[in-house]
Curated annotation (Swiss-Prot):
Function in brief: Tubulin is the major constituent of microtubules, a cylinder consisting of laterally associated linear protofilaments composed of alpha- and beta-tubulin heterodimers. Microtubules grow by the addition of GTP-tubulin dimers to the microtubule end, where a stabilizing cap forms. Below the cap, tubulin dimers are in GDP-bound state, owing to GTPase activity of alpha-tubulin.
GO cellular component labels: cytoplasm; extracellular exosome; extracellular vesicle; intercellular bridge; microtubule; microtubule cytoskeleton; mitotic spindle; nucleus
Name of the molecule in the record: Tubulin beta-2A chain
Family the entry assigns: Belongs to the tubulin family.
Coiled-coil ranges per UniProt: none
SMART domains referenced in this protein's UniProt entry, alphabetically: Tubulin, Tubulin_C
Molecular function terms from GO: GTP binding; GTPase activity; metal ion binding; structural constituent of cytoskeleton
Note on domains (UniProt): The MREI motif is common among all beta-tubulin isoforms and may be critical for tubulin autoregulation.
Cofactor(s) required, per the database record: Mg(2+)
Tissue: High expression in brain, where it represents 30% of all beta-tubulins.
UniProt modified residues of type N6-succinyllysine: 58
Amino acid sequence: MREIVHIQAGQCGNQIGAKFWEVISDEHGIDPTGSYHGDSDLQLERINVYYNEAAGNKYVPRAILVDLEPGTMDSVRSGPFGQIFRPDNFVFGQSGAGNNWAKGHYTEGAELVDSVLDVVRKESESCDCLQGFQLTHSLGGGTGSGMGTLLISKIREEYPDRIMNTFSVMPSPKVSDTVVEPYNATLSVHQLVENTDETYSIDNEALYDICFRTLKLTTPTYGDLNHLVSATMSGVTTCLRFPGQLNADLRKLAVNMVPFPRLHFFMPGFAPLTSRGSQQYRALTVPELTQQMFDSKNMMAACDPRHGRYLTVAAIFRGRMSMKEVDEQMLNVQNKNSSYFVEWIPNNVKTAVCDIPPRGLKMSATFIGNSTAIQELFKRISEQFTAMFRRKAFLHWYTGEGMDEMEFTEAESNMNDLVSEYQQYQDATADEQGEFEEEEGEDEA
């Protein structure tokens, strides 16, 4: 079967990753000891996409946990599903990267990377037909961003024809942990543009807004944010884990979603997002899911899709529902909002349907959009980067680890190129008649 090797790097990556394993273990009926207690054969049918079967019918996540300090991994180990992971797959250093990309990428991380690659090889060799890798990390810190991107490029060298998929938490202005986030993020994006096939851009600011506005949580914790991320990750990977009427794997997804190799940064979304209290007051229908899923308030990246146009979209519906209705609704969205989809890619919305809904819901939908509006996110990081870099603020932390200023300049211009590529395709029309229609569409919106 088509296996995926999961890697989580750094504090953020490990926390999101741990939550992801809790959610999908629950969906597959696997308890914290790795034993199966499910009630449906469908749960086991494609279990080996994410799990290895060990002696005594134990299922072990095909996960590799990486960090440059032991702290976060200790808390994962003592967390609810800590005992399910294979002990050899915890790879950690002692020194920490101190939110410094250079330490993660060139010094501390580079020392640890070989032992991580050994574990990656071990996991890949036990696969029947390896489909690809997924990495969870953040771009603002040191380990997830610096060492995460180092791992990506090393894995890319060794497995050039496998899909590389990342869930990357972008730094956001409202939720900032460190001053040097713009540096770390820009240096990381420089790597991601070249070395990944699909990157889901997740943004703490957007997650906060969802928790606050939609879920009515007055003081959202990181646990709440990570819960949203794991719901999305679970949705994105549904097709790979359960049989469905229209299945996708990582490669099919990439083929459908990436029109130009550099433009592979997706905005994920999820529906239904309802606060815990008001769940039973809403009937979930396919039209409602579709409408909610395309709503900018449901996007996990702090960009407004109405400010750009969709190059491609993938929607994954879960639950028992009529295929005909799903198709009608998706067409309906495209027809009503045609100005927001580029007209030079016909049929640019793909739908997949899986029969098994997530726990506690009758049906749900996960949205993956490749929208030119994502440039807002890169512009934001780029502005912050430029402000600091112009004064060479904090640069000594990076040059002290052996980095060169040239590398910063290159990363900056690569990011700006990315922004202008998105802009160029946003403005492109199949013929010049398109501009008039676009203005009309804006009046309605």
